[in-house]
Amino acid sequence: MTPWFLYLIRTADNKLYTGITTDVERRYQQHQSGKGAKALRGKGELTLAFSAPVGNRSLALRAEYRVKQLTKRQKERLVAEGAVFAELLNSLQTPEIKSD
């Protein structure tokens, strides 16, 4: 099974783009060359701000969704403190208990 990664790319105007991939370097190069997400085209210099292994595709999709819901401040904290991402990932792996 190929591991999936979550990554954040910082644009020239300091915005953070969130995505998932099985190969961070390849995907980053695609974004750099304008062949990646339309949201990053024409945004100037891009830098890889954060990447971390997530596990399988299903978990990566859930992590991506959760990170995209975060505020800019929360995303900056995630970039600065790896423990924040570890907590987020752990919360996705813990099964939710539904009460009747």
UniProtKB/Swiss-Prot annotation:
Q: Which CDD domains match?
A: GIY-YIG_UPF0213
Q: Where is the GIY-YIG domain?
A: 2-77
What the entry lists under InterPro entries is as follows: GIY-YIG_endonuc, GIY-YIG_endonuc_sf, UPF0213_domain, UPF0213_GIY-YIG_endonuc
Q: Tell me which domain of life the UniProt entry assigns to the organism this sequence originates from.
A: Bacteria
SMART domains from the entry?
GIYc
HAMAP family in the cross-refs: UPF0213
Per the record, the similarity remark reads:
Belongs to the UPF0213 family.
Q: Which PANTHER family match?
A: UPF0213 PROTEIN YHBQ (PTHR34477:SF1)
> What is the name listed in the Swiss-Prot or TrEMBL entry for this protein?
UPF0213 protein YhbQ
Protein's organism: Escherichia coli O127:H6 (strain E2348/69 / EPEC)
Starting at the broadest rank, the lineage of the source organism is:
Bacteria, Pseudomonadati, Pseudomonadota, Gammaproteobacteria, Enterobacterales
Q: Which gene encodes it?
A: yhbQ
